[in-house]
Swiss-Prot record:
Protein's UniProt name: Probable endonuclease 4
Organism, as annotated: Pelodictyon phaeoclathratiforme (strain DSM 5477 / BU-1)
Record-linked CDD domains: AP2Ec
Note describing how the cofactor binds: Binds 3 Zn(2+) ions.
Top-level division of the source organism's lineage: Bacteria
The organism's taxonomic lineage, starting at the top: Bacteria, Pseudomonadati, Chlorobiota, Chlorobiia, Chlorobiales
Amino acid sequence: MKRVGAHVSTAGGVENAPLQATSIGAKAFALFTKNQRQWKAPKLTTSSIEAFKKNCEAGGFRPEHILPHDSYLINLGSPDPEKLQRAREAFIEEMQRAEELGLLLLNFHPGSHLKEIAEERCLELIAESINRALDATKTVTAVIENTAGQGTNLGNRFEQLAFLVDRIEDKTRVGVCLDTCHLFASGYDLQTTAAIESTFMEFDRIVGLRYLRGMHLNDAMQPLGSRIDRHAGIGKGTIGMDAFRWIMNNPACEEIPLILETPDSAAWSEEISLLYALEQ
C-alpha cells in the first residue's frame, strides 16, 4: 500500500498530530516533536506519550509510516566546534524524543559548510555526528533528506548522500528521504516518466533503493536545476503530474511515508485523494 500523508501540526501537543492526519485522510504523517525553531523544549510528558501512541493506533499509523523531522537549527557539519557540539547534543535529544514516542525514523537535513570548510570535511563531520547519535540511542533510523542545494547546504547530489551512507557504521539504522522538489531543484529531471525512471535508476546505482525510507511529495515553483527550494501544490508547478503518477505506481514506494509539504494545508485532503486516484 502507498502511505500518503502530510507534515501535520502538533498544536496543543504531539498527541494531536495523528488526529490531524486522520482528519485529512492520511495513511502516514510527519511532525516536529518540538518547536523546530528553538534549541530547548520541555520534556514529553507520560500522558502526552501515551495519548500519542493511542491516537496512532486508532488511526492505523504504524511507526514505520511516521516521519518526524528534526529542528531547522541543527547543522551536523558545522565548522564551528562549539556550534557543532550543540548541534550534536540537540540531534541526540531529537532521536531520544522519537524513541520515547515509539517511533523508528528521524528525518533531517545533512548540514552546511558555510564556506568555512571544504565540502568533504563537512560531509565527514556530518557522518561522524550521525554515528555518535546512533551510538547514543537504540532504535531510531537516521533518515537523511536530499536538499535543493541552496546556499552552502550539502546533500543535493546522490554522490554526497552515498558518501554519508558509506560512512555510517550501523547500516541498518541509516536511510534516505527523497524530496521531489529538492531533486528537481538540484537538477534531477522528473518531468516525464522516462526522466523520473532514469533519476531513480541513478539513485539506486549510486546510493541504493534499499535505503529509501520516505519521500516528500512536492511540486516545484522554480525550473529544473534552480537550486531554489520553493514548493508548489501537486500538479501546479514545474514538475507536473507524470512524476507523481510514477511514484504512486512504483513498488519501491510501497509502505514508506509519502509526505506532502505543499504550501496550502487546506488542500492536503484534496491532494491526498488526487494522488491515490493516480494508482492503476
